[in-house]
Amino acid sequence: MASKWIEEQPLVHRRDIRISSKSRIAAGLLVLLVLWRYGLPSSIHFGFSSEEPKQLGAVASEHALCSRYGADMLERGGNAADAMVATMFCIGVVGMYHSGIGGGGFMLIKSPDGDFEFVDFRETAPAAIVALGKNTSAGLRSGVPGEVRGLEYLHRKYGVLPWSVVLEPAIRTARDGFLVQEDLVNYIDMAVEETGEDFLSKHPSWAVDFSPSGSRVRLGDTMTRRRLAATLERISVDGPDAFYSGPIAEDMVASLRNVGGIMTLEDLANYTVVTRDTSHIDYRGYQITSTTAPSSGTIAMNILKVLDTYDEFFTPGTTELSTHRMIEAMKFAFGLRTRLGDPSFVHGMEEYENHILSAEMIDHIRQSISDSHTQDTSAYNPDGLEVVNSTGTAHIATVDHQGLAISATTTINRLFGNQIMCDRTGIIMNNEMDDFSVPTSSPPTFGHTPSSTNFAEPGKRPLSAISPAIILHPDGSLFLIAGSAGSNWITTTTVQNIISGIDQNLAAQEILATPRVHHQLIPNHAIFETTYDNGTVDFLSQLGHEVTWYPPAASMAHLIRVNADGGFDPAGDPRLKNSGGVVALQRRKFW
């Protein structure tokens, strides 16, 4: 009965509660009358409790509105799983340029008992997949979406609120509208510039949402996505199966086939999530858990494990040399990444990832790093294999006071996916098939050979840079929920944020504000955010590094740090104008 009551009630925020002055006076007089009549102790406290509200958990994401919705779930008696589902569905509505139900991703979960689970809800190649290439039609670039199944798995195993309750904020936001803010405007402009075409206004299916009055939505406008609201409502009422069969599935298949796609209803009906092994290391005594292939969690762990061998690392006076060592570790790790692929299709992948984290490999890399110079690409990648680049993505972190912690990253790949909007459902389809390596008989980009471990096959999942991580103190208590969005910067950003938290003991917002550097080996140059220290960059140039600059917009991380007193410190990346972390508080009650 309680669940039914919750399901029927609208979300109520504390700001909605209003008590007039007259009502307060009347209530006070009534209480005084009762005290006078029955002689109750005169020392009783009236009004709200003076104690600080209890923290129920926290949420961090690329949009403060969605983080607020996640926190609402915690304040309504839900847990971190409920918060994650509500937040991710919301991000798909307002941050549709990065993610949505037409995509997929990876999720790392720490249960209250301390067990870890890696849930792979990455898109899969359709059964009729053909060789991909530069001229592949848009319809062939979409993989079978996994986000809805991933959230279903999380909710069924860990959630406590009804499914319809956790979807309600996203449905309401899509139906009633949301404010067009700076980040959305920025990504709209980037997508139009990238394609050279204003598809958001000129294509009828996109224009319904993005140009309802004939011109593109602008900063401060209210934007609605009513077709998507109806789709989410169907998923809310009929369950996740409604996405993978029936009218919603038929619309996805038809929309893709109209532009040369091969996805079938059978592909959608057969989609399943996969639970995989996690990767674990110790770093400065902290226990770090991440994911495995086809994600790049093992690569992030390799970088950190190499850097753990240096005693003086980002201590006073060592910043320049520490940055060089970190970049060198990145280059060796990305060389190892060239042989990663979907373990369900690549024989020996588990053994290879164990080798990546073995003492022998770590010692080999450490001995190969010179403090006096960098090296040619062949030293890090002797097989000459290409480095696959991922794009897009949105990262979310949630935690509750019972110890359930989740780090999840979801994506439709490049901005607005493959730029196909399903006509009837408002779903934006992914272009995840572009993350597969492409066989070629001609010299490939940068002169490197495509990796056969990441060639497309029916049902296979492409390699990804996604690297969610959860870090525990040496005593086993929760310290940090980390992860990032933004192409191959995901892996290196996650590493640097962990270093900032552990080695430099920074607060959440300080971690995220720290300038970043990225090196993925191919192309062979270190990319520095324009806010990076010039002296450090000059030092690296003297060691032989090719350096380039990039605005602080390549990677977006959102994380939750747990303070020494057990309080939650969530934060959104300051590189985004509208990101945010929210702490969920127990609602105060009258005595």
From Swiss-Prot:
Enzyme Commission no: 3.4.19.13, 2.3.2.2
Record flagged with keyword Glycoprotein: yes
Active site, per annotation: 393 (nucleophile)
Secretion signal, residue range per the UniProt entry: 1-41
Pfam families: G_glu_transpept (PF01019)
Keywords: Acyltransferase, Glycoprotein, Hydrolase, Protease, Signal, Transferase
Residues bound to L-glutamate: 122, 411, 432, 464-465
Glycosylation sites: 135, 270, 389, 534
A GO biological process held by the record: glutathione catabolic process
Consequence of gene disruption: Does not alter the production of ustiloxin B.
A GO molecular-function descriptor: leukotriene C4 gamma-glutamyl transferase activity
GO cellular component, one term: plasma membrane
Transmembrane segments: none
Pathway the protein acts in: Mycotoxin biosynthesis
Superkingdom per UniProt: Eukaryota
Catalytic activities: an N-terminal (5-L-glutamyl)-[peptide] + an alpha-amino acid = 5-L-glutamyl amino acid + an N-terminal L-alpha-aminoacyl-[peptide]; glutathione + H2O = L-cysteinylglycine + L-glutamate; an S-substituted glutathione + H2O = an S-substituted L-cysteinylglycine + L-glutamate
The keyword S-adenosyl-L-methionine is annotated on this UniProt entry: no
PANTHER family attached to this UniProt entry: GAMMA GLUTAMYL TRANSPEPTIDASE, GLUTATHIONE HYDROLASE
Family the entry assigns: Belongs to the gamma-glutamyltransferase family.
Function description: Gamma-glutamyltransferase; part of the gene cluster that mediates the biosynthesis of the secondary metabolite ustiloxin B, an antimitotic tetrapeptide. First, ustA is processed by the subtilisin-like endoprotease Kex2 that is outside the ustiloxin B gene cluster, at the C-terminal side of Arg-Lys, after transfer to Golgi apparatus through the endoplasmic reticulum (ER). Cleavage by KEX2 generates 16 peptides YAIG-I to YAIG-XVI.
Name the record gives this protein: Glutathione hydrolase
Originating organism: Aspergillus flavus (strain ATCC 200026 / FGSC A1120 / IAM 13836 / NRRL 3357 / JCM 12722 / SRRC 167)
Gene giving rise to this polypeptide: ustH
